[in-house]
Amino acid sequence: MRLGVNIDHVATIREARKTFEPSVLEAAFIAKRAGAHQITMHLREDRRHIKDEDVRLVRTSVEIPLNLEMAPTQEIKTIALEIKPQRVTLVPEKRQEVTTEGGLDILSNADYLKNYIKDFKENQIEVSFFIDPDLGQVEASKFTGADAIELHTGRFAESFHKRDFRLLEEEKNRLRKAATLARELGLNVYAGHGITYQNIHLILDLKGLIEELNIGHSIISNAVLFGLEKAITKMLGIIS
C-alpha cells in the first residue's frame, strides 16, 4: 500500500503569519527522503493555504508524483493543465468549510464531469474522484470516465474517534464494498481523510483492495509534537 503525504498544513502554519516559513517545498523534499510515494496538495479556490507557486515549485523541483486536489472549476483546471501533475483528484469545495466535508456527487454531475475531465485524459493526467463509499457513486465514476476513486474515510475516522463501534463496523463494510466494486470495474482505489496513527490499522485490513492512502493532518500534527523538543534544543544551542 502506497502513502501519499498531504503537505497542505505546512502551508497552513505559514499562512497563519503570512510569512515565508515553513517552506512547503522543503516539506516535499523531506517527504520524498522519508520514503513517501507521492505528494498531495489541495489548491483551493480561496488559496487559504497552498498557493499556485507552491504547486509549481513542487512539480518542477521534486522528483516524486504529484496529486493535485482541486474543485472542478475552469480556473483551477487551467492551472492544473499548465502544471501537469501526475494526477488530479476532483473534490467538492465550500468556502465556509474548515476541511473537505464529504465526497463529490458524481451521480448529479455526471455529464458536466465527463466533459470536464476530457482535457486531463488527453494530457495523460490520471483523473481520480473523491467520493463517499457509495456503490452508486462508484458506478457513476466509472461511467463518467475516471481512472480512479479516492474513498472518503471521514465518517469511518469520526466513528473511531467517538468509539461508536457499531457505526465503525458499518463504515468499514461500506469502504470494503465500494473498493471491491471499484476494483471489479477496473478503477484504481485510494482512500483518505481523517486517517491517523491510531485508526490506520483498521484501514490496513483492506490492503488488498485499497492501493494508496493519502494522509496529511495526522502526519503534520505528529511532526509538530515530536519535532518540538529537537527544535527547542537547537535554538538553545544557538543561544548558548
Curated annotation (Swiss-Prot):
Its EC number is 2.6.99.2. This is Pyridoxine 5'-phosphate synthase. It is an enzyme of class 2 (transferase). Catalyzes the complicated ring closure reaction between the two acyclic compounds 1-deoxy-D-xylulose-5-phosphate (DXP) and 3-amino-2-oxopropyl phosphate (1-amino-acetone-3-phosphate or AAP) to form pyridoxine 5'-phosphate (PNP) and inorganic phosphate. Gene3D superfamilies: Aldolase class I. The lineage of its organism: Bacteria, Pseudomonadati, Aquificota, Aquificia, Aquificales. The active site is at H42 (proton acceptor), E69 (proton acceptor), H193 (proton donor). Belongs to the PNP synthase family. It comes from the Bacteria. GO terms for biological process: pyridoxine biosynthetic process. GO terms for cellular component: cytosol. It comes from Hydrogenobaculum sp. (strain Y04AAS1). The record marks E150 as: Transition state stabilizer. 3-amino-2-oxopropyl phosphate binds at N6, R17, G194, G216, H217. NCBIfam families: pdxJ (TIGR00559), PRK05265.1-3 (NF003625), PRK05265.1-5 (NF003627).
